[in-house]
């Protein structure tokens, strides 16, 4: 059996607080993601979902346990990993073409080759004709398309996505979710997609992982046995979608309530 693309084994992550204390974001978290799998991660606010992505990417190192990507221990920034953040990560002073070409240029591509590849990806994400626009001249959905092109142009074997569509309106979000599935289907990348939206997680993923209220650990994993290719709007009306939703929500709801009670208590102190 092939090794997982991503392995987290008994991972704990602690941070120092400004007052000299210790905050534990993750505790004894174990998770595998297979090569080519689309894995969604859901959990209440503050459960360590984004921290998990940071550990996989090498932006943060585990306090205990082990993180491996493609069989190798993560000891720093991980090669072959793309990251799409919740907030726009475009350079405001660069055009769409310059933003998308920046990755290949950083990796040593000649300027002309980088621009040719950038134009190809700009077309693939539906932004042909906008190459010379600046980020402030684009809508939120268009900037997200730029972000996808920025990540995918580098051919990542692993794509990490941290609530990338959360700030978009419902209609644009649906379009972007379908766009993501279309682009992903043409690659062999493993995806770890963090979201607060359980419906989004089920519509996109092969498997949904539920994280407990912090310190986060895996509470359960659920296979999403819905056919592909999918239309994320239409798939929600299938009876099986509702069954999967109810099964996951029955576990996720308790963690959301725990997190909510903690927030109320903290606000009252």
Task: Locate predicted features.
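Helix-to-loop junction immediately C-terminal to a conserved catalytic motif
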Residues: 57
